[in-house]
Amino acid sequence: MDLSELERDNTGRCRLSSPVPAVCLKEPCVLGVDEAGRGPVLGPMVYAICYCPLSRLADLEALKVADSKTLTENERERLFAKMEEDGDFVGWALDILSPNLISTSMLGRVKYNLNSMSHDTAAGLIQHAMDQNVKVTQVFVDTVGMPETYQARLQQRFPGIEVTVKAKADSLFPVVSAASIIAKVARDQAVKNWQFVESLQGLDSDYGSGYPNDPKTKAWLRKHVDPVFGFPQFVRFSWSTAQAILEKEAESVTWEDSAAEEDPEGPGRITSYFSQGPQACRPQVSHKYFQERGLETATSL
């Protein structure tokens, strides 16, 4: 799989797709959606679709595709190579979301959580296939969150398509199994060949599974945290594991707004402004604009 586009710029998102088989432009097709790397604190999350004509679904099943988590890396790569050889009836596309994109989205002023990101990415890939004139008539999706809600959302967006969302869909439907293999092969390759934009001394590539509860991954995070700049962009700094290490190992920063929010005095209850007690005599704090410029209210001239 050629991920050179991602290797040139791994700070955002990258979409790749196979050529569309001619038969998929003419015959009704089934499409599967799955992801790899949703939970790890390291590396990208990859969403993939795989599609083929309904008339050739038995040929896809004959490849003996299975849930990627039950296969070894060599088995996944062998099956992906077979799907590439069968490009006359099998097509695919994938979206690679970088750790940097995931974290900045989750921690932005307007929060964009991982579930919403996942739903939108899956829908975007289905739309991508349709924009390429693939005759999609059935879609099978491995669920994120409540399957009923997710299915209703996709069905509303794609009213002309029969949508099925199930837990463990990657072990129930071969076309979803194929998508899971494609996603996992792409993520494994992306992680293995990750281009660090930071100049890191003594970079250790042995970071374990990348999952938050892996001791080797935690050790790697502690080793490569900078006390001022934090983690390299390979790390999803929005994950609680990374945040806990930052709080312990990095320099603390107090922002003015944070200090104001943590003020124990606070504004208090609204009824306190109408009381005659000592709190009613609390001096009013002027706006930050006036404090920064040393401006005070003049009571006399």
Swiss-Prot record:
PANTHER family: RIBONUCLEASE H2 SUBUNIT A. The keyword Metal-binding applies. Manganese or magnesium. Binds 1 divalent metal ion per monomer in the absence of substrate. May bind a second metal ion after substrate binding. This is Ribonuclease H2 subunit A. Keywords: Acetylation, Endonuclease, Hydrolase, Metal-binding, Nuclease, Nucleus, Phosphoprotein. Disulfide bonds: none annotated. The RNase H2 complex is a heterotrimer composed of the catalytic subunit RNASEH2A and the non-catalytic subunits RNASEH2B and RNASEH2C. The modification Phosphothreonine is found at residue 217. Coiled coil: none annotated. The keyword Repeat does not apply. One of its GO terms (cellular component) is nucleus. Its main location: nucleus. It comes from the Eukaryota. The gene is Rnaseh2a. The lineage of its organism: Eukaryota, Metazoa, Chordata, Craniata, Vertebrata. It comes from Rattus norvegicus.
